[in-house]
Amino acid sequence: MATRAQAREAVVSLLYAYDMGNTEIRKFAIELLEEKRIKNRQQEFALELFDGTIAHLGEIDEEIKKHLKEWDFSRIGDMERAILRLGTFEIVYSGVDRAVIINEAVELSKTFGNDNSPRFVNGVLDALRPDLKKG
C-alpha cells in the first residue's frame, strides 16, 4: 500500500504535467496513480490534492508570489513550482499540520529539485501565515 508521501510525489508529477501544458492529465490520473500502486484511500487523497490545487491555482499562485523574496514567479523551476503549489494548497486548505506539510515538501524538493530547492521551498512555505485557512 502506498503512503501519503508517495501519493504527494505522484501529485507533484501530475501538477508538473499540467503546468507543462497537459491540461487533460486529469483524465489519465487514476491510471497513472495505479501504475505507481497508489490505490484506495491514498488514491482518493492524491486526487483530492490534485483537484483542489487545480481548482485554487490562481489563489495559490498569488499566495506564493507574496512570499518570493527577490524572485520572479516565472523563474521558479517547474518541479519547485509544482511542489510549492501542492504545499501551499495543503497549508491553506487542509487540516494537516504545517510542519508535516513543509517537511514533505522539502523531501520532495530533495528528490525533484536542485541543491538549493529544499531551502527555497522551506522558506516560501514557512512564510505562509498560519491563519490563512480558507473554506
Swiss-Prot record:
Instruction: Provide any one GO MF term from the record.
Output: RNA binding
Q: Name one Pfam family in it.
A: NusB
User: What keywords are assigned to this protein?
Assistant: RNA-binding, Transcription, Transcription antitermination, Transcription regulation
Q: Which domain of life does the UniProt lineage start with?
A: Bacteria
A Gene Ontology biological process annotation?
A: DNA-templated transcription termination
Gene3D superfamilies reported in the protein's UniProt record = NusB-like
- Gene Ontology CC annotation, any one: cytosol
Instruction: Output the InterPro entries linked to this UniProt entry.
Output: NusB-like_sf, NusB_fam, NusB_RsmB_TIM44
Family of the protein in this entry: Belongs to the NusB family.
Give the protein's function.
Answer: Involved in transcription antitermination. Required for transcription of ribosomal RNA (rRNA) genes. Binds specifically to the boxA antiterminator sequence of the ribosomal RNA (rrn) operons.
Q: Tell me what this protein is called.
A: Transcription antitermination protein NusB
Q: Which gene encodes it?
A: nusB
